[in-house]
Amino acid sequence: MSTLRTEYLENVAPKLQEEFGYSNAMQIPRLSKVVLNMGLGEAIQNNKILEGAVDELTLISGQKPVVTKAKKSIAAFKLREGMPIGVTATLRRDRMYDFLNKLVNVTLPRVRDFRGISPKAFDGRGNYTLGIREQIIFPEINYDRIDKVKGLNITIVTTAKNDEEGRRLLTLLGMPFRK
C-alpha cells in the first residue's frame, strides 16, 4: 500500500469525518481517480508529436495512455473525424496515490517561482483540475530527448459533494494551495 493511501486511511479520513460530522464512513470524501490529458492539435500535421506524447505520458503515469480521436470534423482546423488529437491516461488505486505523492513532493516544487496552486480550480462537485505548462518538470522526462515542450491537464476526481470538502481533502493530503 502506498504511503499516501496509508496517510489517508489513518489520519485524513478520521479528521474529515470529525470536521464535517459524517455519520457513515462511506460519506467521507476520497480520491476516485486521476486523469492525465494532453491535447495535441499539432498532431494533425505531424504524427511524430503524437508518438512523443505517448512515450512521455507513459513515463509520467507509469501506464500506456489511450490515443483520443476527434469526434467531429472541423474544416477550419483541417480536422477529420477519427483523427488522433490527444492522449489520456486514467490512474486508479495505488498508481493514483503514488502519482499524487510524486506530484506534491517532487514535481510541483520543481516549478519555477512556485507559490502554490490555485484554490479556485474546482468544478463545483469537489473535483480539481491542474494545468501544467511544460512536461519537463516531471523527473522522468529527459530534457535532451524531448522534441517539443507540451503541457498537460491533471484532473483529480474525488467523491466529495462540494468544493469545500474536496479542497479540505486535498489540503490534508498535502496539496500546496496558494493562500
Swiss-Prot record:
**InterPro entries for the chain:** Ribosomal_uL5, Ribosomal_uL5_bac-type, Ribosomal_uL5_C, Ribosomal_uL5_CS, Ribosomal_uL5_dom_sf, Ribosomal_uL5_N
UniProt KW keywords = Ribonucleoprotein, Ribosomal protein, RNA-binding, rRNA-binding, tRNA-binding
Give the molecular function GO annotations. Answer: rRNA binding; structural constituent of ribosome; tRNA binding
Q: Which Pfam families match?
A: Ribosomal_L5, Ribosomal_L5_C
**Keyword Ribosomal protein on this protein?**
yes
For the biological process aspect of GO, one term held by this record is: translation
Listed GO CC annotations: ribonucleoprotein complex; ribosome
Function recorded in the entry: This is one of the proteins that bind and probably mediate the attachment of the 5S RNA into the large ribosomal subunit, where it forms part of the central protuberance. In the 70S ribosome it contacts protein S13 of the 30S subunit (bridge B1b), connecting the 2 subunits; this bridge is implicated in subunit movement. Contacts the P site tRNA; the 5S rRNA and some of its associated proteins might help stabilize positioning of ribosome-bound tRNAs.
Q: Which family does it belong to?
A: Belongs to the universal ribosomal protein uL5 family.
- Assembly mode: Part of the 50S ribosomal subunit; part of the 5S rRNA/L5/L18/L25 subcomplex. Contacts the 5S rRNA and the P site tRNA. Forms a bridge to the 30S subunit in the 70S ribosome.
The molecule here is called Large ribosomal subunit protein uL5
Q: Which organism is it from?
A: Desulfatibacillum aliphaticivorans
Tell me the organism's taxonomic lineage.
Bacteria, Pseudomonadati, Thermodesulfobacteriota, Desulfobacteria, Desulfobacterales
